Amino acid sequence: MAFLVERCGGEMVVSMERSHGRSTTTAAAVTAAPAPFLSKTYQLVDDPSTDDVVSWGEDEATFVVWRPPEFARDLLPNYFKHNNFSSFVRQLNTYGFRKIVADRWEFANEFFRKGAKHLLSEIHRRKSSSCSQPQPPPPFPMHQHYPLSLFSPPTTPRSPPVGAAAAAAYHFQEEYCSSPADYAGGGGDLLAALSEDNRQLRRRNSLLLSELAHMRKLYNDIIYFLQNHVEPVAPPPLAAATSCRLVELGPSTTERRRCAASPSGDNDDDAAVRLFGVRLDDDHGKKRRVQLVQEDEGDEQGSEG
């Protein structure tokens, strides 16, 4: 006689089988234990040392993945045999978790709360609509028997089975057996979440495009105002250019400094007539004018005598 533990539906059933294999008697029905995925997820979220990456929500009825890259790289390999965040989200969807906020990864389930680990057994996998259709025979028996003690769950890991569906079941460590239909059961929720994120991005893109169009219009209005209301600077006229040339023909800077430095003859220099910077009257001219004046006076006196 041997005690056999098998998983049927959502319960652990302990069976007692005789050596001849003719009759099997059910000894007891054990309360269903939570799925390994749920237990590990609860342990991962409840760890206070990783609150900067994943933590409980404000009401402690949700949990938030604050930094998905670090969550997938550093935390997932410690609890699961993969580091794929998308696969983790798909598994949450298969157990009825929903994404409640569009702009962050916050998930909720009515039986997944802080301090209520006993409620995890109330969370079950979703039944896919394709389960009613006939399925091909699995690559390994659906019910695996383990000769263990009466209430001990299996503790030693199994070797990876062969086959696509079996490999998926071993990869995520959800149950002892799985099928491709169950694995893809939560794809609709993930698609809805991604569609909502896509709509948010499109809305933000439209807002940025409208702001860009407004800035372009403002820029064009400023250019139009400057062209129609601001007069351009006129070029210098020809007279100004000519005066500049006459200034260049004037006395040199050295002569000006010498004339300014001379203490006497300032008034004479100012009254003197110049041509191209050269004085037309000098000392010889003064003497000549004095001689002419004296001759004129002599002529006047002779005429009077």
From Swiss-Prot:
A motif (Nuclear localization signal) lies at residues 286-289. SMART domains: HSF (SM00415). One of its GO terms (cellular component) is nucleus. Residues 201-230 are annotated as: Hydrophobic repeat HR-A/B. One of its GO terms (biological process) is regulation of transcription by RNA polymerase II. Exhibits temperature-dependent phosphorylation. It is found in: Nucleus. It holds the Pfam family HSF_DNA-bind. GO terms for molecular function: DNA-binding transcription factor activity; sequence-specific DNA binding. Residues 286-305 are annotated as: Disordered. Keywords: DNA-binding, Nucleus, Phosphoprotein, Stress response, Transcription, Transcription regulation. Residues 294-305 have a biased composition (Acidic residues). Coiled coil: none annotated. Homotrimer. The hydrophobic-rich region (HR-A/B) corresponds to the oligomerization domain. Transcriptional regulator that specifically binds DNA of heat shock promoter elements (HSE). Belongs to the HSF family. Class B subfamily. This is Heat stress transcription factor B-4d.
